[in-house]
């Protein structure tokens, strides 16, 4: 598929003078090419054009003395790296990958590591050598790893003790896999030891001059149906888009510290804990957090000079379960949330107990961030904010026509005739799947929504999750939001359920809070139904309620409504 590319307001991206707030390309080594009607660099590499730039700024004494990466493990160990130290260590990593590992430009490398400093080194090392990194979660089991290695034809995998045994169980079935690189203090048969090799590696490395549109990363999307798809991103769609986005939502300066709590396999991690802070010269804070612990997070926020917090809504909900009056956050001034629906109740409670707003960010693996509520924008409960300037985001109908404000439709990004910077390159080996997601001139986000007169987008629900009952279209998140306001509900998922008279009715799967487990279920069902009727339009109330111990989720924590829905309709004989 051929697409035209654009970078609006190119002059804002680079110039001739060093500034502590703006990264600048080395113009002499970049050859402008025409993408549509805009100029863009023919070559771009985040490691050399951003990290090495800030290392030079530090050397010139024009950046504050704060770290670029501040890591801790909760057991007293802390690591602080400046951009100069980060630059040198990532060059050593690049030498390990191209030297001892014998990997070549374009080879694909699975990186399955927890939140340890080596993850950041490995991604930068891959960038420097022109390798394609593929992040994966340490929650994967052998079957997950096997699928990813086989589908991607990965030449190498980088992993720790957490998954090494799982890798060894499937490696013989992966004919393309040649290198297993272990990040551990221990040794393991058949594996190279990264830490040992790093100590001996040179700090001198010539960064590969990667093409802007050259493949940089592959993310396996956590779809709720079918095998994961391989979403491919270029050096341009990751790095240059980060520069275009960062200042317009985080507002970070070189003296700021941002903490993004995310699994290393998620797109949010590379955006909020790698690309976007570093293009602005800010510090990234990382806590190992092998298991999420609300008290640990609150203590860190109270004790460390963290200015900006980014996390999924569930993180804020879990923090709110603690007594926040015992904590003070003297440095925290900005909170952002993305990845799932932010309940108005969560936003209101957080504001009441901390005095801070939670601002939504919205996007997907394929697009990166497309909407946000920036620090200078007003917060509207239930709204995702407005589109970034370089994305034309609209609500469209089933024919691909743009709908006026206030009309419900599919949230989509215009990709024709200009395929915008930041959009992924496509699904690897699956151009049909890429094309199937385009309606008219627009890329479908897979979400239903409404755009208001001010340009704010209101999320209604996933396109395939919408419930149509007696002619009423009901978004599951609206019902879930209502249920979550009741103290009996710890977690919930709402789907459609077959009904002989209405076609479909709303059904809620509910995980009860511990203190309500002994309550009469029939009575509790009635209480919850009446509660929903009291806080939202009565036609939305769940006519069916099923109490469960847990909900099916993907490895990245998303509730699999599709799995619940398939089981529900199959049981009825109407699947």
UniProtKB/Swiss-Prot annotation:
ATP binds at residues 221-229, 360-365, 447, 462, 558. One of its GO terms (molecular function) is ATP binding. SUPFAM superfamilies: Acetyl-CoA synthetase-like. CoA binds at residues 139, 470-472, 502, 533, 541-543. The lineage of its organism: Eukaryota, Metazoa, Chordata, Craniata, Vertebrata. Gene3D superfamilies: 3.30.300.30, N-terminal domain of ligase-like. Its main location: mitochondrion. GO terms for biological process: fatty acid metabolic process. Pfam families: AMP-binding, AMP-binding_C. Signal peptide: none annotated. This is Acyl-coenzyme A synthetase ACSM2, mitochondrial. Catalyzes the activation of fatty acids by CoA to produce an acyl-CoA, the first step in fatty acid metabolism. Capable of activating medium-chain fatty acids (e.g. butyric (C4) to decanoic (C10) acids), and certain carboxylate-containing xenobiotics, e.g. benzoate. It comes from the Eukaryota. It catalyses: a medium-chain fatty acid + ATP + CoA = a medium-chain fatty acyl-CoA + AMP + diphosphate; benzoate + ATP + CoA = benzoyl-CoA + AMP + diphosphate; hexanoate + ATP + CoA = hexanoyl-CoA + AMP + diphosphate; butanoate + ATP + CoA = butanoyl-CoA + AMP + diphosphate. Substrate binds at residues 365, 473. Its cofactor is Mg(2+); Mn(2+). Monomer. The keyword Ligase applies. One of its GO terms (cellular component) is mitochondrion. Its EC number is 6.2.1.2, 6.2.1.25. Belongs to the ATP-dependent AMP-binding enzyme family. Keywords: ATP-binding, Fatty acid metabolism, Ligase, Lipid metabolism, Magnesium, Metal-binding, Mitochondrion, Nucleotide-binding, Transit peptide. It is found in: Mitochondrion. InterPro entries: AMP-bd_C, AMP-bd_C_sf, AMP-binding_CS, AMP-dep_synth/lig_dom, ANL_N_sf, Mitochondrial_ACSM. The gene is Acsm2.
């Amino acid at each position: 598929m051929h697409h035209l590319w654009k970078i609006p307001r190119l002059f804002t991206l680079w110039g001739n003078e060093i500034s502590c707030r703006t990264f600048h390309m080395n113009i002499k080594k970049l050859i402008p090419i025409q993408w549509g009607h805009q100029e863009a660099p023919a070559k771009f590499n985040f490691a050399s054009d951003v990290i090495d730039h800030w290392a030079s700024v530090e050397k010139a004494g024009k950046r504050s003395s704060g770290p670029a990466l501040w890591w801790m493990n909760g057991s007293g160990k802390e690591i602080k790296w400046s951009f100069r130290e980060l630059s040198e260590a990532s060059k050593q990593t690049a030498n390990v990958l191209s030297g001892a590992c014998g990997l070549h430009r374009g080879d694909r490398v699975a990186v399955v590591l927890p939140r340890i400093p080596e993850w950041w080194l490995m991604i930068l090392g891959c960038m420097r050598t022109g390798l394609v990194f593929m992040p994966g979660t340490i929650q994967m089991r052998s079957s997950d790893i096997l699928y990813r290695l086989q589908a991607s034809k990965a030449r190498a995998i980088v992993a720790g003790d957490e998954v090494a045994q799982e890798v060894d169980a499937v490696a013989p079935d992966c004919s393309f896999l040649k290198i297993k690189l272990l990040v551990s203090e221990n040794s393991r048969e058949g594996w190279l030891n990264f830490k040992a090799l790093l100590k001996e590696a040179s700090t001198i490395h010539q960064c590969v001059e990667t093409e802007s549109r050259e493949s940089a990363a592959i993310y396996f999307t956590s779809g709720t149906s079918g095998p994961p798809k391989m979403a491919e991103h270029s050096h341009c769609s990751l790095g240059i888009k980060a520069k275009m986005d960062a200042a317009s939502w985080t507002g970070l300066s070189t003296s700021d510290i941002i903490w993004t709590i995310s699994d290393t396999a998620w797109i949010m991690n590379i955006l909020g804990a790698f690309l976007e802070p570093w293009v602005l010269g800010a510090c990234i804070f990382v806590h190992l957090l092998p298991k999420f612990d609300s008290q640990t997070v609150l203590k860190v926020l109270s004790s460390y000079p963290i200015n900006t917090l980014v996390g999924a809504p569930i993180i804020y909900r879990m923090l709110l379960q603690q007594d926040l009056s015992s904590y003070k956050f003297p440095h925290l001034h900005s909170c952002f949330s993305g990845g799932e629906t932010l309940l108005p109740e969560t936003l209101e409670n957080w504001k009441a107990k901390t005095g801070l707003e939670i601002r939504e960010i919205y996007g997907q693996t394929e697009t990166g961030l497309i909407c946000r509520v920036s620090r200078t924008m007003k917060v509207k409960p239930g709204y995702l904010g407005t589109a970034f300037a370089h994305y034309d985001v609209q609500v469209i109908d089933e024919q691909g026509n743009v709908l006026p404000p206030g009309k419900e439709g599919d949230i989509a990004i215009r990709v024709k005739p200009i395929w915008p910077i930041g959009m992924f390159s496509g699904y690897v080996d699956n151009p049909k799947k890429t094309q199937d997601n385009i309606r008219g001139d627009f890329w479908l986000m897979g979400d239903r929504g409404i755009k208001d007169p001010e340009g704010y987008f209101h999320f209604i629900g996933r396109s395939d999750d919408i419930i149509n009952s007696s002619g009423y279209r009901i978004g599951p998140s609206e019902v879930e939001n209502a249920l979550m306001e009741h103290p009996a509900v710890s977690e919930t998922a709402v789907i459609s359920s077959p009904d002989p008279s209405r076609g479909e009715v709303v059904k809620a799967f509910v995980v009860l809070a511990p203190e309500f487990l002994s309550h009469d279920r029939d009575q509790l069902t009635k209480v919850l139904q009446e509660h929903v009727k009291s806080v939202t339009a009565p036609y939305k109330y769940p006519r069916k309620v099923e109490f469960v111990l847990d909900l099916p989720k993907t490895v990245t924590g998303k509730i699999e409504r599709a799995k619940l829905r398939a089981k529900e309709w199959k049981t009825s004989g109407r699947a």
